[in-house]
Amino acid sequence: MKAKELREKSIEELNTELLNLLREQFNLRMQAASGQLQQSHLLKQVRRDVARVKTLLNEKAGA
């Protein structure tokens, strides 16, 4: 997910995206803990996407 795509979204859409990413992160962590996760790079990717969304939410809240 690109930051440029996220900047075009509203605050409500960003909050929805954040919830979806957190759910996905939880599911990936559970798969990793049970040894079922084949693509371990997804954990890092989702964690960074969460950070991008949170950063944009903070920027929009300050503006």
Swiss-Prot record:
Name listed for the protein in its UniProt record: Large ribosomal subunit protein uL29
Q: What's a BP term from Gene Ontology annotated to this protein?
A: translation
**Transmembrane feature ranges:** none
The UniProt keyword set, sorted, is: Ribonucleoprotein, Ribosomal protein
Lineage top rank: taxon: Bacteria
Q: Which HAMAP family match?
A: Ribosomal_uL29
Q: Which family does it belong to?
A: Belongs to the universal ribosomal protein uL29 family.
Which GO molecular function terms does the record list?
structural constituent of ribosome
| Keyword Ribonucleoprotein (UniProt) | yes
Q: Which InterPro entries match?
A: Ribosomal_protein_uL29, Ribosomal_uL29, Ribosomal_uL29_CS, Ribosomal_uL29_sf
Q: Name one GO cellular component term.
A: cytosolic large ribosomal subunit
Q: Which NCBIfam families match?
A: L29
